[in-house]
Every structure is written in structure tokens, then in C-alpha cells.
Amino acid sequence: MLSVAGLDQLPPVGPPEVALAGRSNVGKSSLINALLGRGDAARTSNTPGRTQQLNYFSLDGGRLWLVDMPGYGYAKAPKEQVEAWTRLVFAYLRGRPTLRLVCLLIDARHGAKANDLEVMDLLAKAAVPFLPVLTKADLVGPTDLRRRLDEIEKRLARQAAALPGPMATSAKKGAGLDAFRARLAAYALPEGENRP
């Protein structure tokens, strides 16, 4: 729908927004494509750090906007550019009145890494509600997946801004997508409400 490189390019305040954050190559673009039912809405890449802007996608007939944020933890770009992306992301998180939730995507194969935990702390300090969502759940066995979810749940108990009930998804196999869509739908404008 729209790509934003600076705060002055943000769209006018409209429907509620849910942002997707996560380490580079965690599968944000693949998850967006699966949610939208399109393979080409968000560009996927094996190169970490490909997303360098805030990318807006319309979901549920325009009743909710998804915002794909630049990945953290890796970026093959000059330091000044990485710092500019970081400023954009944090300014967006602090100041966007329609931002309702940040879905913090975590690779199910590895669980929460140090930089994921730092982002959880940052979101808690900014009082931005967040929901951890494991990606690539099809690549781990059920026992390991349950253990990862339990580890995250324990950590969430210490985070005031965290929503209970971390989720597990697989963009490739479709596992968990219906439950995730239902969770997102709770933030959408009611059916028939005026949209900008």
C-alpha cells in the first residue's frame, strides 16, 4: 500500500495499525504474504536487512493496517543508514496514535535471542502492547515448540506491556494462521465503520 522512509511520509491517521517487528530473516514478509493470501505482497529475501522502510499493507478490507518494520540485529548497510532506520522505527513506536499492537516475531528454531529480549524491554518501557509470535514453527518438533512457548510465557510474566498467550505460526504450512488472523481481527475497525 505504502512505503515510508521518514516520519513526514506517514499516512494520515486512519484505521488501527498492527506492526510486525523481529530480527532480520525471521520471516516477517512471508507471514504477511500468508496473512494476505498473496505470495508477492511483501518481498521476501534470503538477504538479511532487505526491509529498510515501514511498509504498509491493508488487511481485512482496509479495516486494519499491517506495518512491516525493518528487521533488527543485522543490516548490510552503512552505519548512518542503520541509525536512520532505527530512529524512524522508534519514533514511529513512540508517536503513532493508531498503533494498537506490535507483534514481535521470533524464529521458533532459536527462541528469543538477546536482541529480542532487548526489544521486549524497550516496548515495555514505551508502554506499547506486544505479542510474541513464533515463526517457522514447522521447522521444529512439537516438544521443542512447546518449550519455546513456555520459555517466552515465563519471560512475559515480567513484562507489563506483554499480552499473554504467545502464538506459533508457519507461513509455509499455514499452521496457526487462522488463530493469528482472529487475534488481529480484534484490533480492526468494526464492519461498516467509516474508513479514511
Where are the language model's segments positioned?
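Canonical P-loop GTPase G-domain recognition
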Residues: 1-7, 139-196
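Short, glycine/charged-enriched secondary-structure capping and boundary segments
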Residues: 14-15, 35, 79-82, 117-121, ...
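Residue-level signal for inorganic ion chemistry
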Residues: 57, 135, 180
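Conserved C-terminal guanine-recognition region of P-loop GTPase G domains, centered on the G4
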Residues: 87-164
